[in-house]
Structure formats: structure tokens, C-alpha cells
């Protein structure tokens, strides 16, 4: 049992903050220092999970949310993930910061879907970062249904030959909402 705990701890240690560094910016430094929720998923090599894992975060009182999702998908594995952020407090003015790190190892495929719904008084950032190794794929599907002012940064680093990333974004603007999107796919060369 102790050996298993050490294995899990080492896996988290190797994955957490491997794509988004705390020293990257003031936004990430604040995110890591105020982190109050999150999820870690490690899919082993050669595992196919057809049924999507759905992660729902519901805010039913005024609060700051600094949530972090870390997903590692092993070699030749396939995984589907859906995250849903819902805030039922229309007068909630507390800031939020959501960070997702996704790593697709050789031959892995990840379908990552995200639905956010934050009320109009909130302000926040959503950073989604991915790494793809040889012959791997990350499909990002983002539905930004927020009334809040949100900065979205979606960056995927293509590290391996034959790997790819796709991004689809749907958003609805309402009232005086300001939504900013920065999307990058960075090809780092053959490996």
C-alpha cells in the first residue's frame, strides 16, 4: 500500500505544474498561491476509455475559485473529458482562475470539452495548456457561455512528429461582457 501511495505521489509530482509554470506570470503565481480546488487524472498506457469522465464544479455561494485540472494520458491511450463550471450566484463578484494542463504521450488521443457559465459580475482567467508527443492528438472543445469578463488562453505545444491539436470555440456575448481569446498551436519540431 505504501509503495502504491508513493507511486501516486510521484505521478502527481511529475505532472502538476509541468505545462503551466507558477513563475510564468503574475496570473499563474496568484493562481498557484490561492489554489483551492482541482482534479488529477492519470490514464495509464494502452487504455481506451470510451465513456467520458464528467467533472462538474457548482458554485452556490459567493467565493473565489482557483481550480486546477491536470490530465496525463499514457502511450496509445484514448480519453474523453468534459468539465462544466456553473455559478448560480448572479451577484457573485469574486474573481476566478481556472488552469488546465493536458499531456498526450505518444499515440494518445484526448477529447477535452469545457463548458463555463460565470455570472456577469465576475472577472477571471481560464488557461488551458497542452503538450502532444509523437502521433498524439488533443481536441479542445470550448463553450464559453459566461456573462462574466473572461480572458481565455488556449495554447498547445506540438512536440512530436505526427502529433496535432484542434480547437473549437463557441461563445455567446451578452450585455457589456468582454471576452478575450488567445489561441496558439506551437510546433516545436520533429522528435
Task: Give each language-model segment a name.
Residues 3-8:
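Short, small-residue-biased leader/transition segments that mark boundaries at the very start
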Residues 11-191:
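Conserved beta-strand/loop scaffold segments within soluble protein domains that form the structured core
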